[in-house]
């Protein structure tokens, strides 16, 4: 990334949109001497073009410039490190949710219960939405897949392996490998 950043005009603000570990923007700024920001995007592989066009919110450093570029969007002012953590927190939670509902599906199957009825009852509460509760998932498989969740869970677990979140993610990753083989 440093090669690309160094080839850009010096007065060009640089926002990285892909998922990067917390602290990466700061390191890139220090290495290149440029202002490098992170502004995560929230895309689904199946609908990435529409998702990109209709991002509901924008957050990162230099929020005033972004208000001009993205008028009418919800703007949240935060550091790039906070934005980097938002993206990981979002994706890892999605993977946790998929894994949890796959476990509930598995229990329902073993107990002779109708998962769709149980799911509908759970979703009747306003605390949980239906995103990531479909079993099997949109790809027709169990567990989480795609390009983002597996790599993000692995990276987050590795980065925080000695922290409680790292300890939580190890069994999630193991369970997911069982579900994906299913």
Residue ranges of predicted features:
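Rossmann-fold dinucleotide-binding core
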Residues: 2, 6, 13-87, 156
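Short, hydrophobic/amphipathic alpha-helical packing segments
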Residues: 5, 98-101
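Alpha-helix boundary recognition
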Residues: 6-9, 123
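A short, structure-level motif marking secondary-structure boundaries and short turns
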Residues: 10, 88-90, 141-142
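Conserved active-site segment immediately N-terminal to the catalytic lysine
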Residues: 36, 90, 134
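Short-chain dehydrogenase/reductase
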Residues: 60, 90, 94-98, 146
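Interdomain hinge/lid region at the active-site interface
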Residues: 84, 102-182
